[in-house]
């Protein structure tokens, strides 16, 4: 999926607003994913999955940190996320569909906290970006 110049601008603008909330927004997206799609919990058997868990907050911060890294290298996401792609494909063996599920939950979190920012055009750009990140993370599965 190719991001247009306008998509890239939209995504960068969204992340300037949310980057200071990485831990909270990431944790909220994970909690939503675990609640809405319970089978995703199987990848976190060692985590305390309760609301407010330090483990979920820490992992949420990592998730949003990776998204920020992708934004910062939006023209070379594959290079920026290569090690993360290796980890998820070869060691963790996360089902690729889970990246899409988490992306949907992340969109909901952005919509809740920044409804005026998430216009239909920005929503489309952010969705394309999250799909592109998912594609990068699953590229090494093949």
Swiss-Prot record:
Residues reported to bind O2: 59
Binding site for heme b: 88
Protein family according to the UniProt entry: Belongs to the globin family.
SUPFAM superfamilies with a match to the protein in the record: Globin-like
CC per GO annotation: blood microparticle; haptoglobin-hemoglobin complex; hemoglobin complex
Name the UniProt record assigns to this protein: Hemoglobin subunit alpha-A
BP terms from Gene Ontology: hydrogen peroxide catabolic process
